[in-house]
Curated annotation (Swiss-Prot):
Epimerizes UDP-galactose to UDP-glucose. It catalyses: UDP-alpha-D-glucose = UDP-alpha-D-galactose. Its EC number is 5.1.3.2. It comes from Rickettsia bellii (strain RML369-C). It comes from the Bacteria. Belongs to the polysaccharide synthase family. The gene is capD. GO terms for molecular function: UDP-glucose 4-epimerase activity. Gene3D superfamilies: NAD(P)-binding Rossmann-like Domain (3.40.50.720). This is UDP-glucose 4-epimerase. It is an enzyme of class 5 (isomerase). The keyword Zinc-finger does not apply. GO terms for biological process: lipopolysaccharide biosynthetic process.
């Protein structure tokens, strides 16, 4: 599906960029691709990636999605875009909400506008469960990013560029996530700091995240949102699973919730469940393509949203201790950390 095509990955030196490049290299997909462009701000990470991958088809572009000219330059001749650039640390965005706005909203608008002007065929926008019923600056900014993408899709139904959104749950062992924190605390013989023991989070692997984006790329229509069905765990069970894997006697210390944290996350709202299509491992939420002339739609009717339940980390499949251990042991990151323990 990428034969002789040029791909652009914004925020390409991050967890998703590394994971999707690893997939393309491992499965020899890259031999059919014309070019992959990595667009990001950090020249050191780009240099490290360039040396590690050493592939002439992977090109590097220094720039910032906040700067329209830099993303527009990188977009010339691009066929497909994976938009992963974001500020994603919840407490940081609570203290610096304007920075979240500048990157996650205005930066996303720059990407979407450049893609439209440069006649990119398809854009996959990476979002988060925190965009559903958001209570923090990061989630609010991502929710508005989704709204920008869907609005572009609604206005461009007949245009060349297709816009789709993917929503992630917690991506295990991604940069800034809790698993690397717990492992570092175990190795340094420190207490494992847990915010709230009964707090639940969806558990996705980086492999799952790539699967979701590629599924949306292959099957997504204009304005679709895709969600992968994922199991969940409490934070306490996750910490105890890592204790067991690393044979750790570290104490667990409860420190209370951080700024902007939710007790559980939602991947699909009850309003969205009214129109969601169950695709087995995924939900597809089609765009509401109506215009502002509502009178002509009144005869259609609608499911009673009040009777539907949103899809959350509280009502999805809850993993027990042994199941979480098994899931963690399948992660390359955990295997590497075990070797170095």
């Amino acid at each position: 599906m990428f034969v002789d095509k040029t791909l652009l990955i914004t925020g390409g030196t991050g967890s998703f960029g590394n994971a999707v490049l690893s997939r393309f290299l491992k499965n020899d997909i890259i031999k059919d691709i014309k070019e992959i462009r990595i667009f990001s701000r950090d020249e050191k990470k780009q240099e490290d990636m360039r040396i590690a991958l050493n592939n002439p088809k992977i090109k590097f572009y220094i720039g910032d999605v906040r700067n329209y000219n830099s993303i527009d330059d990188a977009m010339k001749g691009v066929d497909y875009v994976f938009h992963a650039a974001a500020l994603k640390q919840v407490p940081t965005c609570e203290f610096y909400p304007m920075e979240a706005i500048n990157t996650n909203i205005l930066g996303a608008e720059n990407v979407l506008r450049a893609a439209t002007i440069n006649k990119v065929a398809k854009v996959i926008v990476l979002s988060t469960d925190k965009a559903v019923y958001p209570i923090n600056a990061m989630g609010l900014s991502k929710a508005l990013m989704e709204k920008l993408a869907i609005a572009k899709a609604r206005m461009n139904v007949r245009d060349k560029t297709v816009f789709c959104v993917t929503r992630y749950g917690n991506v295990m062992a991604s940069r800034g996530s809790v698993i690397p924190l717990f492992i570092n605390q175990i190795k340094q013989n420190k207490d494992l700091t847990i915010t709230e023991p009964s707090m639940t989070r969806f558990l996705m692997s980086l492999v799952d995240s790539v699967d979701l984006v590629l599924y949306a790329f292959e099957y997504g229509h204009q304005g679709d949102i895709f969600v992968q069905k994922s199991p969940a765990s409490t934070i306490e069970v996750l910490a105890k699973a890592l204790q067991g894997i690393f044979n750790s006697k570290n104490k667990i210390r409860f420190i209370g919730t951080r700024h902007g944290e939710k007790h559980y996350e939602s991947l699909v709202s009850s309003e969205e469940m009214a129109k969601a299509e169950d695709l087995g491992n995924y939900y597809r939420i089609p765009m509401d393509g109506r215009d502002l002339n509502y009178a002509k739609y009144f005869v259609e009717g609608e499911k009673k949203i009040a009777l539907l339940e949103d899809y959350t980390s509280h009502n999805t499949k809850r993993l027990n201790l042994e199941e979480v251990k098994e899931l963690l042991l399948n992660l390359d990151y955990v295997q590497e950390e075990l070797k170095n323990a």
